[in-house]
């Protein structure tokens, strides 16, 4: 399912149309939700630390475009990148994936 198809389906749902269950839509929606949660946490923590996107990219040895993609939720990075983000931003990231449960991402900054 591409973004346009997802957006059209979401729009139809918001208009109150009854739509048949679509596992692909649910998967894309879930991934987008996780990406947005992570992106907001990364942006907030980066700003809290007074870092620019370039500073964070340098700490992680990635391109600035990679940081922008994470913060704007255009991509859900693999676990290895999430671990590098956690180290670079001094965060604890807990990803809970359990069959049947909604996946959760908990991001905790150290107490000030």
Task: Explain the meaning of each model-derived region.
Residues 60-76:
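Recognition helix of helix-turn-helix/homeodomain-like DNA-binding domains
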Residues 42, 53-57, 67-70:
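Conserved hydrophobic/aromatic packing and binding residues within compact polymer-binding modules
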Residues 46, 57, 86:
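The alpha-helix within a helix-turn-helix
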Residues 61, 80-96:
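DNA major-groove recognition helix of helix-turn-helix/homeodomain DNA-binding modules
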Residues 1-40, 102-112:
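N-terminal flexible/basic segments that precede or flank functional cores
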Residues 39-47:
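Short, amphipathic alpha-helical "recognition" segments used to contact nucleic acids or chromatin
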Residues 41, 52, 78-81:
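Residues that mark the N-terminal boundary/hinge immediately upstream of a DNA-recognition element
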């Amino acid at each position: 399912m591409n973004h346009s198809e997802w957006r059209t389906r979401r729009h139809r749902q918001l208009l109150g149309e009854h739509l048949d269950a679509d596992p692909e839509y649910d998967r894309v929606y879930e991934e987008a939700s996780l990406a947005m949660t992570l992106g907001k946490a990364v942006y907030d923590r980066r700003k809290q630390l007074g870092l620019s996107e370039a500073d964070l990219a340098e700490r992680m040895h990635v391109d600035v475009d990679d940081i922008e993609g994470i913060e704007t939720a255009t991509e859900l990075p693999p676990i290895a990148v999430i671990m590098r983000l956690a180290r670079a931003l001094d965060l604890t990231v807990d990803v809970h994936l359990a069959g049947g449960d909604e996946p959760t991402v908990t991001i905790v900054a150290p107490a000030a």
